[in-house]
């Protein structure tokens, strides 16, 4: 080989090696870039679901092993937050990744203001009146047809929602559209009075007038929001009408009850103002959340509570062997719901996001997850389970008793209770400690009348909410000497009564038939007045329940003006002698000032 040929061969070899190296390097770069592209593609495949719910209103997990709920359908325990478990379930079910951005709000008005300020969420959980408002404002996305398809295995909501709840959502409308088109229920309940049965009689606790009962001066709490407070006031001032036989036995009782409890006439507003001002002078405090601790500590002996908070309060007190009861006022109770709705500004016609939102509702509506939520937060799920008995078995797990066990020897909390008017209750609490009813109110500041219910000016109120169709199959008879709405006339009930037991029918909720024998719980008789009665009120209580509708702009302004007079100091109540003393003090101060000026001028002249 010639030298020149040898050199050419080396160059050729070098070129080949360089070419191979370049190819390998390019392949590596290509592979790296492809990898980056794959990662980006995977990130793009993740559906972000922005959820906003009430504070402490979902199972956050972290249960201890001894908290495991053992049911025939299997053991239930919350290890992870429920919304984290949803992410894994969604991937396993739909083979798509979803990431839940979970945040909270404190009140319906806070949520509405957050939305008004531009915060964007895909799915939120307001109360019934705020759902009505958002529907009226055309802010919601209707559920897909697939969401209502009971043949789809994963549609746990529509297959398991209580017939009572389903009927309520399907028969109530806003502007001609049913609630169910836009809202899926989450939790529900009634309002009432948690009380200490050793100090407060059940008769006193079974009326809204307990808030002005001076037997419990500075030992009762009331809710610090205009809607709940107004409902109680209307019930109290209309006691004679609402409890009269002619009113209760009227064929259109349910419709008329809702109308009366939503009365915003000037006359009723004036009477409600007077009642709430008297309540303010009698109660320990207006509260939103502190009432539970005040009841458990014994600082107060009765408190206006939502049934879910009532259950929590009774549960916590019972851990310290301190037993509290729950009573629903005889005049009426507010039937409330919290439900999931999808927002247009969040979903934005994104089919994948809507599918994730509807799947989230279905996942938390699965009976075992409904039980997890009920155990963790104390409120009552709208889920009955359909063909799945998990929820009913959970009630039996909590409240059911063996018919062969005699409970007649249990302690009767009504014994040794001295409720005489001479009893001195002041020793149990220091009334001088932190009894500031108006600490959050600054009369010097401008008050935004839209804050409490935040309604826009272009809204039209819906027709009166009517649940008469929902409860028409529920019996009204209230047998004497029994817990309200629970019949104890037959021989088998007499035998149970001898053992301090009772049959507690729950058919209205689980099957839609109040007399369904498959849904009758044998329970400790006291439970009808405690946790069970709060979580699942009797049909008699449901008959006298009413839903509050949302207020239009004019009504909203009127009720807020009333509320300001309740919560702010009312100068009309200042005694005349106080005005006289104040005037004299002002005159004296002016005289001292003038005298000082005169003395100052005379000194300058000298």
Task: List each model region and its residues.
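Long, intrinsically disordered low-complexity tandem-repeat segments
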Residues: 405-468, 480
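Juxtamembrane/start-of-transmembrane alpha-helix segments at the extracytoplasmic/lumenal side
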Residues: 567-584
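Cytoplasmic C-terminal tails of single-pass
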Residues: 601-606
């Amino acid at each position: 080989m010639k030298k020149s040929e040898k050199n050419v061969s080396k160059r050729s070899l070098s070129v080949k090696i360089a070419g191979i190296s370049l190819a390998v390097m390019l392949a590596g770069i290509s592979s790296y870039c492809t990898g980056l592209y794959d990662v980006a593609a995977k990130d793009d495949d993740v559906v972000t679901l922005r959820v906003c719910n009430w504070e402490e209103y979902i199972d956050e997990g972290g249960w201890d092993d001894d908290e495991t709920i053992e049911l025939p359908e299997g053991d239930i325990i919350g290890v992870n937050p429920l919304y984290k478990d949803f992410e894994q379930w969604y991937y396993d079910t739909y083979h798509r990744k979803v990431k839940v951005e979970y945040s909270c709000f404190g009140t319906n008005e806070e949520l509405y203001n957050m939305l008004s300020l531009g915060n964007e969420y895909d799915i939120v959980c307001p109360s019934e009146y705020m759902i009505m408002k958002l529907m009226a404002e055309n802010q919601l996305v209707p559920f897909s047809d697939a969401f209502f398809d009971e043949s789809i295995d994963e549609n746990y909501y529509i297959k398991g929602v209580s017939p009572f709840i389903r009927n309520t959502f399907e028969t109530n409308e806003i502007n001609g559209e049913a609630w169910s088109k836009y809202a899926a229920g989450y939790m529900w309940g009634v309002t009432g009075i948690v009380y200490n049965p050793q100090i407060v009689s059940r008769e006193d606790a079974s009326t809204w007038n307990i808030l002005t009962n001076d037997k419990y001066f500075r030992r009762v709490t009331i809710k610090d929001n205009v809607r709940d407070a107004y409902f109680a006031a209307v019930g109290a001032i209309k006691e004679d009408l609402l409890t009269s036989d002619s009113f209760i036995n009227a064929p259109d009782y349910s419709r008329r009850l809702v109308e009366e409890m939503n009365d915003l006439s000037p006359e009723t507003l004036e009477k409600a103002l007077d009642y709430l001002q008297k309540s303010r002078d009698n109660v320990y405090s207006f509260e939103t959340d502190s009432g539970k601790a005040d009841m458990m500590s014994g600082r107060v002996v009765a408190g206006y509570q939502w049934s879910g908070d009532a259950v929590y309060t009774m549960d916590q007190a019972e851990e310290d062997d301190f037993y509290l009861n729950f009573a629903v006022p005889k005049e009426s109770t507010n039937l409330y719901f919290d439900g999931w709705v999808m927002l247009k500004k969040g979903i934005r016609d994104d089919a994948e996001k809507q599918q994730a939102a509807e799947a989230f509702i279905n996942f938390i509506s699965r009976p075992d997850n409904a039980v997890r939520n009920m155990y963790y937060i104390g409120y009552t799920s709208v889920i009955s389970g359909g063909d799945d008995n998990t929820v009913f078995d959970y009630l039996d797990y909590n409240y059911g008793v063996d018919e062969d066990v005699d409970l007649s020897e249990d302690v009767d909390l009504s014994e040794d209770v001295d409720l005489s008017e001479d009893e001195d209750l002041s020793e149990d609490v220091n009334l001088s400690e932190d009894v500031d009813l108006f600490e959050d109110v600054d009369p010097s500041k401008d008050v935004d009348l839209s804050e409490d219910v935040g309604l826009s000016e272009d809204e039209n109120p819906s027709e009166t909410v009517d649940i008469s169709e929902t409860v028409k199959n529920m019996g009204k008879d209230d047998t004497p000497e029994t817990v309200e709405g629970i019949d104890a006339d037959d021989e088998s009930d007499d035998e149970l009564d001898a053992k301090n037991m009772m049959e507690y029918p729950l058919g209205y909720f689980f099957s839609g038939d109040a007399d369904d024998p498959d849904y009758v719980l044998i329970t400790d008789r006291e439970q009808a007045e405690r946790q069970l009665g709060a979580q699942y009120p009797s049909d008699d209580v449901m008959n006298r329940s009413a839903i509050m509708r949302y207020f239009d702009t004019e009504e909203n302004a009127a009720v807020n003006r009333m509320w300001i007079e309740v919560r702010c100091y009312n100068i009309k109540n200042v005694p005349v002698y106080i005005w006289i003393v104040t005037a004299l003090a002002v005159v004296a101060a002016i005289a001292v000032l003038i005298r000082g000026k005169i003395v100052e001028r005379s000194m300058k002249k000298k």
